[in-house]
Amino acid sequence: MKVVVRAPFYPTESLEKVLSSIFNLFDAPKESCAVVGEGKGRYIECVFHNHKPLEKFRRLLRQQRILDAARSYVERGLREGEVKFYLNKQAAFAGKVSFCTYEAGESPLGSIIVVIELGKCSPDEFLNWLAPRTVNGKPVGEVSELKCLEQGSG
């Protein structure tokens, strides 16, 4: 599994604040991130070769009780072997998960873009791990561990 988290980084923004927006949602070592590009085309990109950074994000979805909304946005972003979704950068700075429908327009300073290459994980297994369906607010069919990662895909 490979996880890429990317956020635009404008000249008027503080590097530390943009990094905080990412680290508030994803458990990640700072060394995994780099500034890419120049001027208005600059962005911060964090690349991880396992699912560990997603564990904090997964916890936040449960704490905020937004599993159904999260599942809907993540399902919408499912493509051939990968998932792509957008998060509001300002909400992330405050430690809150807020999904955006589009990459631009909903988050004034740009969205945080998350791309997950599923590797050997099936979309259903991944969805049921990250954001299972709920009934009366309780997760149903939840996968507690991604078994597909035990097969050596990280």
Swiss-Prot record:
Entries under Gene3D superfamilies matching the protein: 3.30.1440.10
Entry-linked SUPFAM superfamilies: RL5-like (SSF55282)
Family according to the record: Belongs to the UPF0201 family.
The name this protein goes by in its record: UPF0201 protein Tpen_0695
Taxonomic source organism: Thermofilum pendens (strain DSM 2475 / Hrk 5)
Origin organism lineage: Archaea, Thermoproteota, Thermoprotei, Thermofilales, Thermofilaceae
